[in-house]
């Protein structure tokens, strides 16, 4: 997967002087791919760090992840946000690097994953940002927020609480419509917890999403369920669908040994 990760403060972009040493450390002589979620601060800071790395002789390519169908523009982005699909980009691009692809090819694989993955999220509760000490938005016990982000951002609309199947349908419909999923498509289905939702409930969402895809004639060839890209203690989940081809499936299946993903070794 990744050779380096650069966290900023909670819900804050890392700075160029944090990104640069990570970039230099990750470079083995063939260059470095930055995988960046599409948030304005992240984009600007990674651009600056890439320029600094290039000045030190390290070639850098950037894959910008913007899989969130909930927004086109927000206070935090120009265009769609990068959310759950980032995990899939990281795994598959990392596998391409591991098999020996050059810098341009690894970046191209990452961009292909981003072009074929879409995500939508829901919150049943807000999260509390540590430096603020208060919930990021107010949500009644009988309400849910559709289209939330991963940094505690509110969603695009608020509706009364529904059962799990109803919520799943609301999340999945815009994802499938935007991807244009049709009969015969092969997909990876990723149900991601936002941090405070029991795993058993995530599998309830997965069951319904897989059923909807089957009804459309799509085949769920690969799946992932769990808490992988979270918003502290937020209760909720996101659904990501990635359209697969033979190469993307092969790269997803390639051995991986990390704290989060582990198979084939």
Region roles according to the model:
Residues 2-5, 31-40, 47-50, 61-65, ...:
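Short glycine-rich or small-residue beta-strand-to-loop segments that form or flank ligand, phosphate
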Residues 2-29, 176:
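Glycine-rich oxoanion-binding loops at beta->alpha junctions
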Residues 5-10, 54-79, 215-220:
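Short, acidic/small-residue loops that bind anionic groups at enzyme active sites
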Residues 38-43, 91-103, 244-265:
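Extended, charge-rich low-complexity interaction segments
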Residues 64-105, 109-118:
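Short alpha-helices
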Residues 174-265:
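C-terminal non-catalytic interaction/assembly regions of soluble proteins
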